[in-house]
């Protein structure tokens, strides 16, 4: 199952069921705004050494494979295979088109999906599940918050136990959408850093990029239906914004208008 996106999720002036009930350009002249996009350009420093160290300590403390801990925090294995399709191993053959074709619950149209409403396979608080609940409702409405991400790492690749952990490294790139406030800012602010009412993740933030309180971030991992959940209660902040600018990315017509 692939989730269909409306053109207006990424292109201004195109159809999109949002809070404006359709096409929306704001105060931008249509000659400039039609088929343009907004882009949040971000420089995100990542504390990779701290992340890898937490995997070590959590693995030793709870007897879990460190790569499974990493996958639970993210919602995917490092090779991109989602936990909801392969909860026990990253060695799961998927085509490029299948790697994002999944949901967290079954439905009449997709009865074969595993019903993971409790987060047994993919934790409810994991990064990819918080940032894209897929068929789940948003504030009671099926509004999408999808983004187009175009980014690249900066700094040297980190080799755990061999490299200087103080060397700065991270991610630099664009998060592209048709509505910065209701898509990008909503995802980062509400889904990423505000409290959810759902059981098991109350009082938590996104484990990967959330602005955690000082060494007090909390994350819940369910192993099975008989074992008590594992609670990580000392997550640090791993991602820090070093630079940010909101941009308008005109379409071809907009570039002609500016010329």
What is each PLM-predicted segment?
Residues 1-259:
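Long, histidine/aromatic-enriched segments associated with O2/redox biology
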């Amino acid at each position: 199952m692939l989730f269909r996106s409306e053109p207006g999720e990424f292109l201004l002036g195109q159809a999109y069921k949002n809070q404006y009930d359709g096409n929306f350009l704001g105060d931008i002249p249509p000659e400039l705004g039609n088929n343009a996009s907004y882009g949040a350009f971000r420089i995100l420093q990542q504390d990779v050494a701290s992340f890898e160290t937490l995997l070590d300590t959590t693995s030793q403390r709870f007897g879990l494979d460190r790569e499974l801990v990493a996958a639970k925090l993210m919602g995917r294995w490092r090779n991109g295979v989602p936990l909801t399709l392969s909860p026990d191993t990253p060695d799961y053959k998927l085509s490029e088109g299948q790697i994002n074709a999944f949901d967290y619950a079954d439905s009449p149209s997709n009865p074969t999906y595993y019903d993971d409403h409790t987060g047994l396979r993919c934790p409810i608080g994991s990064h990819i599940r918080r940032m894209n609940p897929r068929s789940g409702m948003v504030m009671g409405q099926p509004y999408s918050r999808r983004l187009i991400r175009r980014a690249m790492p900066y700094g040297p690749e980190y080799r755990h136990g061999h490299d200087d952990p103080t060397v700065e490294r991270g991610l630099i790139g664009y998060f592209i959408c048709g509505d910065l406030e209701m898509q990008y800012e909503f995802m980062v602010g509400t889904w990423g850093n505000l409290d959810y009412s759902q059981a098991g993740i109350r009082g938590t933030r996104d484990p990967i990029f959330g602005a955690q309180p000082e060494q007090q971030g909390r994350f819940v991992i369910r192993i099975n239906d008989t074992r008590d959940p594992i609670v990580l209660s000392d997550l640090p902040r791993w991602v820090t914004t070093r630079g940010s600018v909101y941009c308008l990315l005109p379409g071809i017509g907009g570039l002609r208008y500016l010329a």
